[in-house]
């Protein structure tokens, strides 16, 4: 059994839930905001300097967080497009793509491991849907790419592997997390997703 299976996935939690977690640890709630901001900057728990060792030990006894690792990275010599193959904690892999435009950097992220939609033009449907990505794994693609690039990502399109609305609850949580002002602060107007179930048109989500 994976040692994280019975622990709380902190990166999937919104700030009020993390505040409740710290309250249960007997720690002040302001620690939650410190941890939230650090996680969303891609900082490991060990590297956080404003949380004590004793508090970190209490956190790791009950919870965890981590980010996808880069298994492969390809950079286009033509337009600077970056293609990432990210490996998740369970060994599954998903793809993300960085695209550079005059208005900023856009990342295309995956929402599932595999896909059950069966679109003939898409190779990710061959083996069907393996599983949904957790909010932390959706967010983790953006954080890992931001950390690797050393630049701010200003736009997100959810048009990678998987069907976003087939993973509705986790995607909605992700949208709230990625737009939080203490996190990456990418507003809804800068996020688009594809809906292959019906029209295959992009739909933007506004506050």
Question: Model features per residue range: what roles?
Answer:
Residues 1-105:
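Flexible, acidic/Gly-rich N-terminal and inter-domain linker regions that tether
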Residues 100-137:
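Canonical Radical SAM [4Fe-4S] cluster-binding loop centered on the CxxxCxxC motif
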Residues 115, 156, 193:
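Conserved, mostly hydrophobic/aromatic
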Residues 126-155:
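Conserved alpha-helical substructure of the radical SAM core
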Residues 140, 144, 170-177:
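Alpha-helical scaffolding segments of alpha/beta enzyme cores, especially the outer helices
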Residues 159-162, 194-196:
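Glycine-rich beta-strand-to-loop/alpha-helix junction loops that act as flexible
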Residues 197, 201-207:
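Single conserved hydrophobic/aromatic residue that forms the stacking wall/gate
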